[in-house]
Curated annotation (Swiss-Prot):
Protein name per the record: Glycerol kinase
PTM text: The phosphoenolpyruvate-dependent sugar phosphotransferase system (PTS), including enzyme I, and histidine-containing protein (HPr) are required for the phosphorylation, which leads to the activation of the enzyme.
Species in which this protein is naturally found: Staphylococcus saprophyticus subsp. saprophyticus (strain ATCC 15305 / DSM 20229 / NCIMB 8711 / NCTC 7292 / S-41)
GO-annotated biological processes: glycerol catabolic process; glycerol metabolic process; glycerol-3-phosphate metabolic process
Phosphohistidine PTM sites in chain numbering: H230
Similarity remark: Belongs to the FGGY kinase family.
Main enzyme class: transferase
Amino acid sequence: MEKYILSIDQGTTSSRAILFDKEGKIKGIAQREFKQFFPKSGWVEHDANEIWTSVLAVMAEVLNESNVGAEQIASIGITNQRETTVVWDKHTSRPIYHAIVWQSRQTQGICQDLKEQGLEDKFRNKTGLLLDPYFAGTKVKWILDNVEGAREKADNGDLLFGTIDSWLVWKLSGGQAHITDYTNASRTLIYNIYDLEWDQELLDILEIPNTMLPEVKASSEVYAHTIDYHFFGEEVPISGIAGDQQAALFGQACFDRGDVKNTYGTGGFMLMNTGEEAVSSKSGLLTTIAYGLDGKVNYALEGSIFVSGSAIQWLRDGLRMINSAPQSENYAERVESTEGVYVVPAFVGLGTPYWDANARGAIFGLTRGTEKEHFIRATLESLCYQTRDVLEAMEKDSGIKVNNLRVDGGAVKNNFIMQFQADLLNLGVERPEINETTALGAAYLAGLAVGFWDSKDEIANRWNLEKEFQPDMIEKDRERLYKGWKKAVEATQVFKLEDE
């Protein structure tokens, strides 16, 4: 009987279940979207119960569509939208409030208060993170402060907190396991990534009782088993967990110090494996945990690009310049260059290394000769310029010279972007055969724990290159183009509209 790993990929807009065979090939995929809630401007929430039912639905669908029985599942791996926060009653398993999503800015006031108290360096030095609404800790505090009766229930030990991985393990196991893994813990703003434990001082500052916290485990071990009535009569081990970007790093077999992957999704996320050393950043990068495996923890530097693939959606849906994302490649290749046009897509501010929340998008270099093709090409090029910004920050902070870049995400299908990226970085850009690297990473972690795969070496040998893009631009042109981008970003940061 052939066995498979079931990977649950719980994302920001949809839940997916993907079956992988022993070769790391995809046997089947199922996907289901769920509702987004926007109670106030800048707030984003999900219904944690709807996330759970969507996961149940896609698990059933992928088994059914693939004609695979539950008894053929060797283990389950989970990868998840990071930082999104659920607080639930441990007796009823009912959430006491919506899940507050990573994008949500509703804890801006809490973060501002903490900064004004001079606490930013304390949080940074213990967690590797910035004091930002992005991370989970302030979301927990917000729920306890704003939901009636929550603070009292928490103090009585009746409430549990978890990121989405914890919530799904709790539900799949029928409440037998309240756990998370190192990667998700490292995104909470209350986990000390150096001591590898929840930080009591930070918990006290945010007034979070430690009875709420999940136990932190390795990214690959048997945490619990499914209860049979949640998994079609079978008790299957749940044995791999990683936050989505760390899972992609693992799925790309970036196991060595200095290995880098960039995900071109809605936003862009670059991670560099820094080995067993946690590198502090002076360039606006985050220090985080890459994975915990074999009794050791690997660290990573992470850079965030707020607008990546969503810039192409903007061309399609906002400006209606193109009918489909693939069309952008065709338009970009019709012209030799942008003729000096730069698009800075700072629609929601600038991420790494600028961290300018008040910057807004801008276009520079327009002339009467500017045509649609130049504009589209400049928008695609902006993804690559932002990637170079982050990579240069990583090389500076780590002291590591990067030799190549592994890529994944929706925009990597665009050959123009990949070639321009190689030209701009003067590096080989490696596109893998399997683009589902996030789900694959979770599957690998789950499979290693139960002997489905033997070692990281075996996994590294399974990584297959679909295409490598080699640089084909002279240095003078490369540096002239990048210098123009830096001037465009600088001008964008100067232009600020004051609030009325």
